UniProtKB/Swiss-Prot annotation:
It is found in: Virion; Virion tegument; Host cytoplasm; Host Golgi apparatus. Pfam families: Herpes_UL7. Transmembrane segments: none annotated. This is Cytoplasmic envelopment protein 1. Plays a critical role in cytoplasmic virus egress. Participates in the final step of tegumentation and envelope acquisition within the host cytoplasm. Keywords: Host cytoplasm, Host Golgi apparatus, Virion, Virion tegument. Belongs to the herpesviridae cytoplasmic envelopment protein 1 family. InterPro entries: Herpes_UL7. GO terms for cellular component: host cell Golgi apparatus; viral tegument. Its main location: virion. It comes from Saimiriine herpesvirus 2 (strain 11) (SaHV-2).
């Protein structure tokens, strides 16, 4: 994944953290495991009357850190044109290599993951809430300016901007970071002429690559574990309804070893 990013950017490891990433973290969920039961779920939405409850979020993240059942945050990383909203434009074996569990020994990075998970599961985002999430993420980044924090901050700003555009909110972040192009195209086609939609969506927003048969590694081990997946049905979580995505999520969440870095130092 890092190699893909560096090739597309044309930069080396040293200055990569200073660049806008061509990849974004997606499908972020908390993973907890107890014996043979594994649960992947979105971070609870700590929002009251449109206000981000920072202290509650901090308490939740710290409780995860000290829980022996917490495995980490599962996430996948997409290059922008691979995320077609309704479908994923990559083959299962490629998606599998982009899917991992992240568990840094740093509450700042974990809280940024929590913000990402909350953000993609918001049913009714508002301008003030999106701004609060971005501001909190930026504050956290100032406390830990490592490559992973920079990458997560970029993901939060990008998804907040995309959410603002998609729901017609016009939050300030939209003028700072461009929304994801395929989501802009999706909204444009959906809001357009019905006849055109039937023609354009199959051309620009449909991929059958994920329907390719793929036998995930450690399949036998994952089948011995009960796996449950919980999330809110939003425009950012459509991929979690795909059977191949679910199969790979189960495999990774139940059998893989968490990693402490997304991008190497």
């Amino acid at each position: 994944m890092e190699v893909v990013a560096r090739v597309l950017l044309g930069v080396n490891k040293t200055n990569m953290a200073c660049q806008e990433q061509p990849i974004v973290p997606r499908l972020v969920l908390e993973v907890n495991k107890n014996k043979n039961v594994c649960i992947a779920a979105n971070t609870p939405c700590f929002v009251v009357d449109g206000v981000l409850m920072v202290e509650q979020l901090k308490t939740h993240i710290k409780s995860r850190m000290f829980s022996n059942k917490f495995v980490g945050f599962v996430m996948a990383c997409f290059v922008e044109n691979e995320d077609m909203v309704d479908s994923i434009n990559m083959f299962p074996h490629v998606f599998s290599s982009r899917l991992f569990i992240y568990n840094p020994c740093n509450h700042i990075l974990l809280e940024m993951c929590g913000l990402l998970s909350m953000l993609k599961n918001l049913n009714t985002p508002s301008s003030s809430l999106l701004s609060a999430i971005v501001e909190r993420a930026y504050y956290l980044w100032t406390k830990s300016r490592c490559p992973d924090a920079t990458f997560l901050l970029h993901g939060i700003k990008t998804l907040a901007s995309t959410s603002s555009y998609f729901y017609g909110i016009n939050a300030p972040v939209e003028s700072i970071v461009s929304p994801l192009l395929m989501f802009k195209l999706y909204k444009c086609i959906e809001d357009g002429d019905p006849v055109s939609k039937g023609l354009l969506k199959p051309i620009y927003l449909t991929s059958w690559k994920m329907d390719t048969q793929y036998d995930a590694p450690s399949k036998d081990l994952s089948e011995k574990c009960v796996f449950n997946l919980f999330y809110c049905n939003t425009v950012f979580t459509k991929h979690l309804q795909h059977k191949e995505v679910l199969k790979l999520f189960k495999c990774v969440c139940t059998t893989s070893t968490p990693r402490s870095n997304i991008l190497s130092q």
